[in-house]
Amino acid sequence: MKSVTPVLLLILDGFGHRLDGDDNAIALARTPNWDRLRRDHPYGTIDASERAVGLPRGQFGNSEVGHLNIGAGRIVTQDISRIDLDLEEQRFAGNPAFTHAFAAARGHALHILGLLSDGGVHSHENHIHALIRAAQAAGVADIRVHAFLDGRDTPPRSARTYLERLDAVLAECPNARLATVCGRYFAMDRDKRWERVEQAYRLIVDGEAAFQADDGLSALAAAYARDENDEFVRATRIGAPAPMQDGDAVIFMNFRADRARELTSALTDPEFDGFSARQLRLSDYVTLTRYGADYASLSIAYPPQTIRNGFGEYLASQGLRQLRIAETEKYPHVTYFFNGGEETVYPGEDRILVPSPKVATYDLQPEMSAEEVTNRIVEAINSRQYQAIICNYANGDMVGHTGNLPAAIRAVETLDGCINRCVEAMLANGGEVLITADHGNCEQMDDPLHQQPHTQHTTNLVPLCYVGHRPARILEGGALKDIAPTLLALMGLPAPDDMTGHSLVELL
């Protein structure tokens, strides 16, 4: 085994760089440790959004994109950009997975599922609109749209705009109609809260719902009257019941996998046991991108790109040991996404999953499981088993998404103590620390344009702080792609040729 300097990477999810603002949870929180680290150690900012991470211009980053870029050590062109290019160059409608589903739906219904917004994190309404038009042009006679409302990557009450734009598309396509509406809280869970997913499932599959409406806008107005923001709109059937039948085809239009898996499992897995689910014999089920190894039998419209010699794979090739650790909400990001969208656990790679608290929303427990994550990190550091430890702290993002400023402040203050414990343990054991974020969120908690809480990500730069025993400075102009090469340089290892990023810590 090579003798290297051990490193710890702390990824503070949703922790952007913004100096001022009376809605800035980071600036308002009491953070003596973070303040000291920024003051006494090399500190800078790096880019985590738009083209710097393979996204379209103007698109904020997210956890999946962030961890892909961090782990790859290069800009990874994101699925949204690949799909947008196909739309621009008029290849989208001819995608073989789509045309196969259109043919499979003849004599039956085609169900189009997806998050209806322009948030660009899990989906984009433009892709849904284009698919409806393509299905209509292909002669699909019965097209049913199941719209999941956002309010998390978009303002909390912004769905009217998206439903109006969908209505305009449906008016062009007489074979298509809106069949159901519900909030993403139910349809897009990722923490095995099956009681939520079941409500979306019963709505889509059985046409069962506590509420009915004649159209999407009426459904939304009724939900707002019940004081439900977009994310939490309860299952609502639009028009006559339209249950899913054997022989129907399904296309799930979310390009981000993590929040599409549970509903997909309920719809397709014959051994699904989260709740009582009907065994449907669908003619086709298309996922927009690959949702994981457990869904290998499903059709994929945009198969994954292959990323070789990312940070994890490269360390394994050098015979080094690494640890990935996060709580439930961000565990896939430090494992699957950090490894380039691969399920592979590399030789010498250990993983620790700390359960997230079972609360309805994380403003009810803004500390989340950060203390236990920290306990496990300190234990791992003191064991001296690992040459690299990769950790994600979820608090800034998950509490930031609630729009609750006091709770976000508590989340940041929790992180401040956790960061300090990790840094002290690492320095005591001869290691070095990089602290960064995958994207912004909790540094902006108010949306003055829409005059409501800001619950989505930001395009702000994110911090990069080096804490070690060597004098150094942070180079300017970096991005998330530079994190892996920086870690390798600190360890004393050359970066593989596949990595196009460069080290941002210049040792003096």
UniProtKB/Swiss-Prot annotation:
GO terms for molecular function: manganese ion binding; phosphoglycerate mutase activity. Pathway: Carbohydrate degradation; glycolysis; pyruvate from D-glyceraldehyde 3-phosphate: step 3/5. GO terms for cellular component: cytosol. Mn(2+) 2 binds at D13, S63, D438, H439. NCBIfam families: pgm_bpd_ind. Belongs to the BPG-independent phosphoglycerate mutase family. This is 2,3-bisphosphoglycerate-independent phosphoglycerate mutase. The lineage of its organism: Bacteria, Pseudomonadati, Pseudomonadota, Betaproteobacteria, Neisseriales. The gene is gpmI.
